[in-house]
Amino acid sequence: MASVNYPSSFDKKDEFEDMSILDKIWFRCKQQPLVPIGCLATCVAVALAAKGVRTGDRVNAQKWFRWRVGLQGLTLVALVGGSYIYDRQQVTQRKTDEDLAREKAQHRQDLWIQELERRDQETKRNKERARLARARLEAERSTGILDDEPPK
């Protein structure tokens, strides 16, 4: 029994760790949708520039290389901006999680106090019952109904 690891409320299991690689990629793409779009557009610009170089069309190749630089810059701006926005959302989410944890702790404390009060009431009832039983026993002894000594 001692070797069994029981879950703890202090263990903060990150659901991101349990995801597969494709799920992680999809999760990140949903977080910052402009970054994959920018990467795809940059790849298209590089492919078209490579096509221009292969065919010898220097003007077209140069145009697509310029587009590539611009699209990479926009992708970088989208990445930094998305990270900033996501960080702000995480801060507010963290505050919300802390509030929920505080409420949960307060609820547990209230339940614990109720349990202690219930146990206290039960102890008082048991003491009162024992006191009444002792009083009844004393009353029976004084009237002679109950004899503690065995017959000789």
From Swiss-Prot:
This protein's record includes keyword Zinc: no
Protein name, UniProt field: Respiratory supercomplex factor 1, mitochondrial
Organism of origin: Komagataella phaffii (strain GS115 / ATCC 20864)
Entry GO terms, CC: mitochondrial inner membrane; respiratory chain complex
Cellular localisation: Mitochondrion membrane
One GO-annotated biological process of the protein: mitochondrial cytochrome c oxidase assembly
Matches recorded under PANTHER family: HIG1 DOMAIN FAMILY MEMBER 1A, HYPOXIA-INDUCBILE GENE 1 HIG1 -RELATED
Subunit structure, as described in the record: Associates with the respiratory chain complex III/complex IV supercomplex.
Keyword Iron: no
